[in-house]
Design a protein with these regions (language model features):
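N-terminal and secondary-structure boundary signal
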Residues: 1-322, 328-332, 337-344, 351, ...
Length: 372
C-alpha cells in the first residue's frame, strides 16, 4: 500500500490554480491509474448548499478534478453523491456541482435511482451494505472530501465521505444500528474495505471549523491533499487542524486493521508536511472521554443507553427554526415532532428515543439545531 500523501498550497478557488496544485500532488503521491477506465468522482454534499458556506466540496475543485482525470486518460467520468434528504431528480444546483459536471462533459449520476447489496464477509461490524448501483459502472472511485469538523465523528474526511454511497435515508438505518462513535467508525472502515476506493483529492482550500459538518464556519486553510491511501490523507488532515490522529475513531479503527498503515509514522510527505501547515487555533469538536464511554465495552448493551442521559444532545434554537421538517424526515429513531407548545408550533425532541447521531444538526439548513 502506498504511504505517500502529497500536500500542496492553493490559495484560492481559481480553477487553474487548483488544477496545478492537484496535478503536482498526484505526481508526488503517485499510484493513480485511470487510463481507459470509468471514474466515479464522489464529492461531499451534506445538502445542496452554496459554495461560500463551505458545506460541500467546491465546484471549482470538482472542475479541476474532472480536468485532471480526463487528461490522465479516463474513458468516462461520473459525478454524484446522495445527501441525507435528496429531492426527486437531485442535480446539485445550489452547490454548483451539477452545472460544473455538465459544463465539463462529465455525467451526473443519481445515487438514489437504483440500489444493490455489496457483500463484505470479512467485515468487523458490517458484512453487507446497501449502496448505489452506480458503483457497478465505475472502475475507479475517487473520494473528493471537504476538510471539516464533524459533530459525531469529530472530523470528516476521505473515508467518511464514502458513507454517501449509501443512498439517501438508508443511511439512517446505519446510525440506528451503530449509535456509538466507535461502532459507527468500525462500520465506516468496513465500508471503505468493501468499496476499495482508488484515491482521494481533498478540498482543504476552505475548510469548516466549529460545529460541522454543516453548522460550522468557513476557515481558510489554503491546501489540497492527494493520495491513494485514504487513511493517510485523513491522518494528515487531522494533524493540520490540530487533532491527535490516534484519538479520532475512524483513524484508530482503520489503523488497527493494518490494511492502510501499521503506524502513523509510516506516512511519507513528499510535498509539504502537515505539522508545518498546522493551524493551532482551528476550532474543533472537543474530544471527551466520559466514564460512560469507558464503560461501554463492559456494560451489557441495554445498560449502555444510560450514557445518553449524560451525553451531549441536540437542542433547537426556536428563533432560527423555520419548521421545514427536514430534521423530522432524517431522524432515524423518530424522536422528533412538530407540536403545539406555549401557544406556537415548535419542533420537539423526545430524548428517550434520541440516539445522539446528530443527523438533525447536520441536515438543518438554518443552523437552528446545536449540540450541547
Amino acid at each position: 500500500m502506498n504511504k505517500k500523501v502529497a500536500i500542496e498550497s492553493c490559495p484560492s478557488y481559481d480553477p487553474d490554480l487548483i488544477y496545478a496544485a492537484l496535478k503536482r500532488a498526484v505526481e508526488l503521491a503517485g499510484d493513480l491509474d485511470v487510463a481507459g477506465k470509468s471514474v466515479l468522482l464522489k464529492p461531499n454534499i451534506v445538502f445542496d448548499a452554496a459554495p461560500e458556506k463551505a458545506i460541500c466540496t467546491h465546484p471549482a475543485f470538482l472542475e479541476a478534478a474532472i480536468r485532471l482525470v480526463r487528461e490522465m486518460g479516463a474513458s468516462r467520468i461520473l459525478v454524484g453523491d446522495s445527501p441525507g434528504l435528496p429531492p426527486p431528480g437531485f442535480a446539485g444546483k445550489v452547490s454548483g456541482l451539477g452545472e460544473v459536471t455538465k459544463r465539463n462533459n462529465a455525467q451526473w449520476v443519481d445515487f438514489s435511482r437504483e440500489k444493490m447489496e455489496l457483500n463484505y464477509p470479512e467485515g468487523k461490524a458490517q458484512k453487507k451494505f446497501t449502496v448505489s448501483r452506480v458503483l457497478q459502472e465505475a472502475d475507479v472511485v475517487i473520494s473528493l472530501p471537504k476538510l471539516k469538523t464533524h459533530q459525531l465523528m469529530y472530523f470528516t474526511g476521505a473515508m467518511k465521505n464514502l458513507f454517501g454511497l449509501i443512498p439517501s435515508v438508508t443511511k439512517s438505518t446505519y446510525h440506528v444500528r451503530f449509535p456509538e462513535r466507535e461502532s459507527f467508525a468500525s462500520m465506516l472502515v468496513d465500508l471503505n474495505l468493501a468499496i476499495r476506493p482508488a484515491y482521494a483529492f481533498m478540498d482543504a482550500i476552505t475548510g469548516m471549523e466549529g460545529p460541522g459538518p454543516s453548522g460550522g464556519d468557513p476557515r481558510h486553510v489554503g491546501l489540497v491533499l492527494a493520495s491513494s491511501n485514504l487513511l493517510a490523507v485523513d491522518v494528515a488532515a487531522s494533524i493540520i487542524i490540530g487533532y491527535p490522529p490516534k484519538e479520532l475513531p475512524v483513524n484508530k479503527d482503520a489503523l488497527e486493521r493494518g490494511v492502510w498503515l501499521s503506524s502513523f509514522d509510516e506516512i511519507e510527505y513528499p510535498g509539504l508536511s502537515p505539522l508545518e501547515k498546522q493551524i493551532p487555533d482551528y476550532v474543533k469538536i472537543i474530544f471527551k472521554k466520559s466514564n460512560w464511554q469507558l464503560l461501554e465495552f463492559i456494560l451489557p448493551r441495554p445498560l449502555r443507553k444510560l450514557r445518553l442521559s449524560f451525553a451531549p444532545k441536540p437542542k433547537i434554537d426556536h428563533s432560527a427554526c423555520i419548521r421545514c421538517g427536514d430534521c423530522l424526515r432524517i431522524c432515524a429513531s423518530k424522536a422528533m415532532d412538530i407540536a403545539e407548545t406555549g401557544g406556537e408550533r415548535r419542533v420537539i425532541i423526545d430524548y428517550r428515543r434520541c440516539i445522539r447521531c446528530f443527523c438533525c444538526h447536520e441536515i438543518c439548513p438554518e443552523k437552528a439545531i446545536f449540540v450541547k
